[in-house]
């Protein structure tokens, strides 16, 4: 008697199928109802995620979400003698029948919050692994016509740590005191997934959040670079928003002051940390937190690289030119990623030529620039690449309480076009 898959124990079938690469799962779903039911089971999802993470660790591969030219990709980067990057998938997020353009993306434990480029009336939260989405209507408070159609707000996505069902929340705010000190647009609000409501917060800031630093979420809080309300642009503090308490903490002094400062989250030995990259006309410095909570942060120096060392490495020409030009007011690096084991920083950048631009990664170690990776030609010179780490999750996105019909429509709104390993050009 010939044994078929249907005759095998469920646990054995799950173990076999969990070895299938992520980019092949979509094709398996379409094979038959039994395959689709298996792929939808929680036990299989957890096993598959665990095996994917183990495979990535064995390869020394860093998996991350990258936003380029208003599209979102899942990528894997291996930093070794044979430096390589591969595209693991592209996010297809549809509203109706149209692919939406995404201008910002925020990651929180497997969920992505995406901000739309040409539509300020809605945002979308999604779980790429499960293929679930939730579209959320925003509240509009346009004061000038120049804002029309552009989402000028800052965002953060995080879970409440004291919530039994771990429901996520969104913080949304605007404070344009820097541009309109006499009459700033000032609004802080949170969105609750359980109630489907926006709540206005009573905030009277004596500080100013520097949004270009990027907010970093960890341990139920989100952190930004900040300055005192009437201070200069040199960033010498952090400030924390506690999602559980629903408020901001005090200004937390930094061990440095810098104009061009970017934060990034990182995980090391199961401990969540924050990395801070800043530069002057002479050096690039990266610090990493050793202890962090809502009111206190301690730091250690990860490495310091002097521009003179970068200048000796021609593969870093596009990167160090920014520094020797002393463009302190315009930090080219909008986003970066740290590989703690290899002790390198992956700085996402845009290399602009006379006719075309390219999205690139400069991989920098303690001795200077290691290599430059060219990701792809860029069709938009003003859209800088953004990166955040990514770990798949089985967290279900709670849908609006408006019936099954809308839930079904929303689930059709996202798909991941998983391709076979697509190698990217390495310079």
From Swiss-Prot:
SMART domains per UniProt: FBOX
Transmembrane intervals: none
Annotated Pfam families: F-box, FBA_1
Domain F-box: 2-47
Disulphide-bridged cysteine pairs: none
NCBIfam families (alphabetical): F_box_assoc_1 (TIGR01640)
The protein's name in its UniProt record: Putative F-box protein At4g10740
